[in-house]
């Protein structure tokens, strides 16, 4: 079971481009909280606190957002918008969650063991970066780890080959190809030396 990350938030009274830019210049990230049966709430969180929490707890962490009146919102990050030119987070969307109700969340793959493939002059081709999974918020993994160190040329890894954590399900096609491994051609080997 994951820990819950605590983040302080402030309400946003204006959602204009200029107001959001001013927030970012003052070290805040504009965002929204949304959920079933509620109106979206415009908020801002401190950028450095959010980045620290993501680094410590992971992208799929459960957050407890606390406003200036000590009202708490249990949320998960639904979307992180990154400004392409400066590669910085520019906006956040949080989804209100109940810790006792299953949710659907996108989970990224973390590939380990690539150095073994490189030592065998094998090339890894990743077809899918993430998949949607369902489960209770605290059971959603930060990432799904895939060890490719024992794969050989011609091997494929299908979604059905990945063991999901207990309590986690997915409606992804079991035959979905996640990774393939191939040997480098002679020309590619010569070029890499």
Swiss-Prot record:
SUPFAM superfamilies this protein is in?
Ribosomal protein L25-like
Q: Which Gene3D superfamilies match?
A: Ribosomal protein L25, beta domain, Ribosomal Protein L25, Chain P
The Gene Ontology biological process annotation of the record reads:
translation
The secretion signal range is: none
Q: Name a GO molecular-function annotation.
A: structural constituent of ribosome
- The answer on whether this UniProt entry bears the keyword Ribonucleoprotein reads yes
| CDD domains linked to this entry | Ribosomal_L25_TL5_CTC
Its ancestry begins with: Bacteria, Bacillati, Bacillota, Clostridia, Lachnospirales
**In this UniProt entry, which cysteines form S-S bonds?**
none
A Pfam family the protein falls into: Ribosomal_L25p
Purpose: This is one of the proteins that binds to the 5S RNA in the ribosome where it forms part of the central protuberance.
Please provide, in alphabetical order, the Gene Ontology terms of the cellular component aspect for this entry.
cytosolic large ribosomal subunit
Indicate the family of this protein. Belongs to the bacterial ribosomal protein bL25 family. CTC subfamily.
Q: How does it assemble?
A: Part of the 50S ribosomal subunit; part of the 5S rRNA/L5/L18/L25 subcomplex. Contacts the 5S rRNA. Binds to the 5S rRNA independently of L5 and L18.
Q: Which NCBIfam families does this UniProt record tie to the protein? A: bL25_bact_ctc
Q: What is this protein called?
A: Large ribosomal subunit protein bL25
**Which UniProt keywords are present, listed alphabetically?**
Ribonucleoprotein, Ribosomal protein, RNA-binding, rRNA-binding
């Amino acid at each position: 079971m994951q820990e819950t990350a605590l983040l302080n938030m402030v309400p946003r009274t204006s959602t204009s481009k200029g107001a959001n830019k001013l927030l970012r210049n003052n070290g805040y990230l504009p965002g929204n909280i949304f959920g079933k049966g509620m109106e979206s709430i415009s908020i801002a969180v401190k950028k450095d606190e959010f980045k620290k929490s993501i680094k410590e707890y992971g992208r799929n962490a459960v957050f407890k957002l606390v406003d200036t009146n000590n009202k708490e919102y249990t949320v998960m990050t639904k979307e992180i918008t990154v400004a392409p030119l400066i590669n910085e987070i520019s906006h956040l969307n949080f989804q209100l969650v109940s810790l006792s109700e299953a949710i659907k969340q996108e989970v990224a793959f973390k590939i380990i063991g690539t150095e073994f493939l490189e030592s065998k002059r094998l090339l890894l081709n990743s077809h899918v970066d993430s998949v949607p999974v369902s489960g209770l918020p605290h059971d959603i993994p930060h990432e799904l780890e895939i060890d490719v160190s024992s794969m050989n040329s011609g091997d494929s890894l299908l979604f059905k080959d990945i063991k999901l954590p207990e309590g986690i399900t997915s409606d992804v096609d079991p035959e979905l190809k996640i990774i393939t491994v191939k040997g480098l051609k002679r020309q590619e080997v010569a070029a890499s030396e």
